[in-house]
Amino acid sequence: MKSHIESLLAQALDVLKQQEVIPTDFEARIQVDRTKDKTHGDFATNLAMMLTKIARKNPREIAQLIIDSLPEDAQVSKVEIAGPGFINFFIDDSALANQLMTALNDDRLGIALPQAQTVVVDYSSPNLAKEMHVGHLRSTIIGDSVVRALEFMGHKVIRQNHVGDWGTQFGMLLAYMEELRAQSGEQAQMELSDLETFYRAAKVRFDESEEFATRARKLVVALQSGDEYCNKLWREFNDISLSHCHEVYERLGVSLTRADVRGESAYNDDLAQVVRDLDSQGLLSESNGAKVVFQDEFKNKEGEPLPVIIQKADGGYLYATSDMAAMRYRANVLKADRALYFVDLRQALHFQQVFKLARKANFVDDNISLEHMGFGTMNGDDGRPFKTRSGGVVKLVDLLSEADTRALELVRSKNPDMDEAELAKIAKVVGISSVKYADLSKNRASDYIFSFEQMLSFEGNTAPYLLYAYTRVAGIFKRATDVDLSDAKIQLEHEKEKELGTKLAQFNEVLTRMVSKGQPHALCGYLFELAGAFSSFYEACPVLAADTEEQKKSRLLLAKLTAKTLKQGLGLLGIETLERM
């Protein structure tokens, strides 16, 4: 409906151009928003106030001219001017009911497919030298929810898991792997089952033994030179590490597969060419033996230019180099229209610099949108990044296991007579969903405090609340098995029916915002509000005990569409629904 109002306003502007009220070459940005106060209608625009200077008239006068130029439309019952020149649109109840019926009878809930784009999404991207920890949670689940929404909206999505599978630390790890296998193959396999412990043990050997450190450095050189033996060891290690990652992805219900992995090593053969191309365009400078790029747009507090280091003095490459190669690949080979990077906000300057440089070097053209979808940190009660009690890094798999345990205790307390198999099944969904939703419901640009107590609450904007809301709605139909809805129609008569219908009609707008801005919290907030609107409707409007059969069927249809929307919305967040809690 929002896009329909925008279309009506565009037609009105065409009339005003013909009447020479505004110049024919003027391109106005039409913005239509939902009103918060329904006494001011359903939608409002400040378009008239934006045209004041160009039309040389006061806003209310322009607003009236716009209203007079609007085409007749059966979906709009009334248009009014408010305040200094806002234009308020009231949607006809029967038009809203028809929109809801269309959504109910459509697998896509009435959401039209936009012009499809190719969208490359870089997310999760753990360092394979170590096991995944809580710091990887946000990129993984925020990126995955946006990917799901993009695909639902009809876009072609190419997932890119840009894992850290290259670097000097791999010499140390391969040396330790080699050492353990010489002692005992079983010991090596056992230690590799816990990568965090394996990494720490390798680091101790590297720091304490000069002979081990020398061997590790030689292995790095051999690996980078394409040595067959070293490459075999390296591939084995990465395969084991990726297996750990995909166990976590499976538990999280994340859609990443092995086919989506394109790590740093995939660009090794392109890095020297990146340096040559930057050099040939006169963009490279030398600083302390390193090859760098200075850009006038980026300076430190003292006003000195900040470098983008492309190649170290020892010939090694950095993140900027591989990121430039990846951007060129995504633009020219994958033919991306958008490239989204779900990476910590603390990398904002890095991405600003490499995005700007990639355009200057013509690695990408202006047709591709490069977007850093930065996010804040997940913190403990002390407001600092989440750690174990001893100050160590929390492994993601341990966090999920604790969520399962706590969820099982919660579900058992609510259902003391339920059998253990059913309890475990429900607890698994509740535990993982609670961790994911607690994160996704926060503005991604903000830090947040991680709290099991809050995320497992049945009150407020939490996964348990929404999962229970869904089971409550779905449960109505277990008591209405004899009702034939084949010829039923939605009728919006009671105020709470209209409020629920209005909220249901906003699903498309919310998803559009989510995919354009990479903001899952917009969808979370919407689903929470929808559950609240249904609760208010259910209390005020008896469903199975409605006054008439026609009214009962209409309210059952509203309940059915609510259930479909909640299920679809939670599914886009990567959250499985339950029929019973």
Curated annotation (Swiss-Prot):
Signal peptide: none annotated. It is found in: Cytoplasm. HAMAP family: Arg_tRNA_synth (MF_00123). GO terms for biological process: arginyl-tRNA aminoacylation. It catalyses: tRNA(Arg) + L-arginine + ATP = L-arginyl-tRNA(Arg) + AMP + diphosphate. Its main location: cytoplasm. Its EC number is 6.1.1.19. This is Arginine--tRNA ligase.
